[in-house]
A protein has these predicted regions:
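Internal alpha-helical scaffold of NAD(P)-dependent oxidoreductase catalytic cores
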Residues: 2-8, 25-112
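Short alpha-helical
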Residues: 15, 36, 131
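Short beta->alpha linker loops
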Residues: 11-15, 58, 117
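NAD(P)-dependent Rossmann-like dehydrogenase/reductase catalytic/cofactor-binding core
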Residues: 55, 68, 72-79, 83, ...
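Short, flexible turn/loop "capping" segments at secondary-structure junctions
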Residues: 19-24, 116
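Glycine-/Pro-rich loop/turn segments that contact NAD(P) or position catalytic residues
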Residues: 1, 12-21
Length: 173
Protein backbone atom coordinates (compact mmCIF):
# COMPACT_ATOMS: atom_id res chain seq x y z
CA UNK A 1 0.00 0.00 0.00
CA UNK A 2 1.19 3.47 -0.81
CA UNK A 3 -0.05 5.25 2.29
CA UNK A 4 1.62 8.11 4.17
CA UNK A 5 3.73 6.77 7.05
CA UNK A 6 2.76 9.69 9.28
CA UNK A 7 -0.79 8.31 9.46
CA UNK A 8 0.26 5.14 11.30
CA UNK A 9 1.65 4.19 14.69
CA UNK A 10 2.32 0.95 16.52
CA UNK A 11 1.83 0.34 20.24
CA UNK A 12 3.88 -2.06 22.33
CA UNK A 13 4.99 -2.63 25.89
CA UNK A 14 4.51 -4.81 28.97
CA UNK A 15 0.76 -5.13 28.51
CA UNK A 16 -0.69 -8.47 29.56
CA UNK A 17 -4.25 -8.06 28.29
CA UNK A 18 -5.97 -9.35 31.42
CA UNK A 19 -4.15 -6.84 33.62
CA UNK A 20 -4.84 -3.95 31.23
CA UNK A 21 -8.52 -4.94 31.15
CA UNK A 22 -8.51 -4.84 34.96
CA UNK A 23 -7.14 -1.29 34.73
CA UNK A 24 -3.96 -2.14 36.60
CA UNK A 25 -1.18 0.46 36.12
CA UNK A 26 0.68 -0.15 32.88
CA UNK A 27 2.68 1.67 30.21
CA UNK A 28 3.50 1.32 26.54
CA UNK A 29 5.29 3.02 23.66
CA UNK A 30 3.56 4.46 20.59
CA UNK A 31 5.95 4.63 17.64
CA UNK A 32 5.48 6.39 14.33
CA UNK A 33 7.86 7.71 11.71
CA UNK A 34 6.26 11.06 12.51
CA UNK A 35 7.12 12.39 15.97
CA UNK A 36 3.92 14.45 16.03
CA UNK A 37 1.83 11.37 15.21
CA UNK A 38 3.54 9.35 17.96
CA UNK A 39 2.92 12.17 20.47
CA UNK A 40 -0.71 12.47 19.36
CA UNK A 41 -1.35 8.72 19.69
CA UNK A 42 0.42 8.67 23.08
CA UNK A 43 -1.80 11.50 24.29
CA UNK A 44 -5.00 9.88 23.07
CA UNK A 45 -4.15 6.45 24.50
CA UNK A 46 -2.93 7.65 27.91
CA UNK A 47 -5.39 7.27 30.79
CA UNK A 48 -5.20 7.48 34.56
CA UNK A 49 -3.82 3.93 34.70
CA UNK A 50 -2.18 3.54 31.26
CA UNK A 51 0.75 5.82 30.31
CA UNK A 52 1.94 5.87 26.71
CA UNK A 53 5.30 7.30 25.67
CA UNK A 54 6.17 8.47 22.14
CA UNK A 55 8.96 7.17 19.90
CA UNK A 56 9.99 7.38 16.26
CA UNK A 57 11.76 3.99 16.35
CA UNK A 58 9.07 2.01 14.54
CA UNK A 59 11.46 -0.78 13.58
CA UNK A 60 12.66 -1.21 17.17
CA UNK A 61 9.23 -1.11 18.80
CA UNK A 62 7.75 -3.55 16.27
CA UNK A 63 10.72 -5.91 16.55
CA UNK A 64 10.58 -5.84 20.36
CA UNK A 65 6.86 -6.59 20.31
CA UNK A 66 7.23 -9.67 18.16
CA UNK A 67 10.69 -11.07 18.82
CA UNK A 68 10.33 -11.20 22.61
CA UNK A 69 7.74 -13.94 22.09
CA UNK A 70 10.48 -16.30 20.90
CA UNK A 71 12.43 -15.68 24.12
CA UNK A 72 9.25 -16.24 26.15
CA UNK A 73 8.80 -19.63 24.45
CA UNK A 74 12.34 -20.58 25.45
CA UNK A 75 11.88 -19.40 29.05
CA UNK A 76 8.60 -21.30 29.24
CA UNK A 77 10.28 -24.44 27.89
CA UNK A 78 12.99 -24.18 30.54
CA UNK A 79 10.39 -23.77 33.28
CA UNK A 80 8.31 -26.64 31.95
CA UNK A 81 11.43 -28.82 31.96
CA UNK A 82 11.93 -28.00 35.64
CA UNK A 83 14.74 -25.45 35.49
CA UNK A 84 14.79 -22.44 37.81
CA UNK A 85 15.59 -18.75 38.06
CA UNK A 86 19.20 -18.93 36.90
CA UNK A 87 18.23 -20.62 33.65
CA UNK A 88 15.34 -18.23 33.03
CA UNK A 89 17.57 -15.21 33.70
CA UNK A 90 20.25 -16.57 31.37
CA UNK A 91 17.74 -17.06 28.55
CA UNK A 92 16.12 -13.66 29.07
CA UNK A 93 19.44 -11.80 29.28
CA UNK A 94 21.11 -13.49 26.32
CA UNK A 95 17.84 -13.32 24.40
CA UNK A 96 17.63 -9.57 24.95
CA UNK A 97 21.26 -9.11 23.88
CA UNK A 98 20.73 -11.10 20.69
CA UNK A 99 17.42 -9.41 19.86
CA UNK A 100 19.09 -6.02 20.36
CA UNK A 101 21.92 -6.97 17.99
CA UNK A 102 19.41 -8.20 15.42
CA UNK A 103 17.31 -5.06 15.80
CA UNK A 104 20.26 -2.71 15.42
CA UNK A 105 21.36 -4.61 12.30
CA UNK A 106 17.84 -4.09 10.90
CA UNK A 107 17.93 -0.35 11.62
CA UNK A 108 16.44 -0.14 15.13
CA UNK A 109 17.81 1.98 17.96
CA UNK A 110 19.53 -0.03 20.71
CA UNK A 111 17.93 2.05 23.49
CA UNK A 112 14.47 0.90 22.41
CA UNK A 113 15.37 -2.62 23.53
CA UNK A 114 16.29 -1.28 27.00
CA UNK A 115 12.89 0.40 27.44
CA UNK A 116 9.25 -0.53 27.87
CA UNK A 117 8.87 -2.11 24.42
CA UNK A 118 12.00 -4.19 24.95
CA UNK A 119 13.06 -5.29 28.42
CA UNK A 120 9.74 -4.21 29.93
CA UNK A 121 7.68 -6.40 27.63
CA UNK A 122 10.26 -9.19 27.85
CA UNK A 123 10.04 -9.32 31.66
CA UNK A 124 6.23 -9.38 31.63
CA UNK A 125 6.01 -11.95 28.85
CA UNK A 126 8.72 -14.28 30.16
CA UNK A 127 7.58 -14.32 33.75
CA UNK A 128 3.82 -14.63 33.74
CA UNK A 129 1.40 -17.52 33.37
CA UNK A 130 -0.87 -14.90 31.73
CA UNK A 131 1.54 -14.91 28.77
CA UNK A 132 0.39 -17.22 25.98
CA UNK A 133 3.95 -17.68 24.72
CA UNK A 134 5.38 -18.49 28.14
CA UNK A 135 2.56 -20.97 28.82
CA UNK A 136 2.91 -22.56 25.38
CA UNK A 137 6.65 -22.96 25.94
CA UNK A 138 6.05 -24.45 29.41
CA UNK A 139 3.76 -27.04 27.86
CA UNK A 140 6.45 -27.90 25.30
CA UNK A 141 8.98 -28.17 28.14
CA UNK A 142 6.68 -30.62 29.92
CA UNK A 143 6.87 -32.87 26.86
CA UNK A 144 3.80 -31.88 24.86
CA UNK A 145 4.02 -31.73 21.09
CA UNK A 146 3.29 -28.46 19.28
CA UNK A 147 -0.14 -29.84 18.34
CA UNK A 148 -0.91 -30.85 21.94
CA UNK A 149 0.27 -27.50 23.31
CA UNK A 150 -1.86 -25.70 20.71
CA UNK A 151 -4.97 -27.61 21.77
CA UNK A 152 -4.61 -26.70 25.46
CA UNK A 153 -3.48 -23.11 24.89
CA UNK A 154 -5.65 -20.12 25.61
CA UNK A 155 -5.18 -18.16 22.40
CA UNK A 156 -2.45 -17.87 19.82
CA UNK A 157 1.22 -18.22 20.77
CA UNK A 158 2.70 -15.71 18.32
CA UNK A 159 6.23 -16.88 19.07
CA UNK A 160 5.76 -20.16 17.21
CA UNK A 161 5.53 -18.68 13.68
CA UNK A 162 7.83 -15.80 14.69
CA UNK A 163 10.65 -18.28 15.35
CA UNK A 164 11.07 -18.89 11.62
CA UNK A 165 11.21 -15.13 11.00
CA UNK A 166 13.92 -14.73 13.66
CA UNK A 167 16.00 -17.45 12.00
CA UNK A 168 15.58 -15.76 8.60
CA UNK A 169 16.52 -12.34 10.03
CA UNK A 170 19.54 -13.88 11.76
CA UNK A 171 20.72 -15.36 8.48
CA UNK A 172 20.15 -12.04 6.68
CA UNK A 173 22.04 -9.94 9.22
Amino acid sequence: LDLPADRFACLSGPNLSKEVAQRQPAAAVAASESHSTAVKVAGIATTGYFKVFASTDVIGVEMCGSLKNVVALAVGMSRGAGFGENTAAMIETRGLAELTQLGVAAGAQAQTFAGLAGVGDLVATCGSPLSRNYTFGANLGKGMSVDEATKVSNGVAEGVPTTAAVVALGEKY
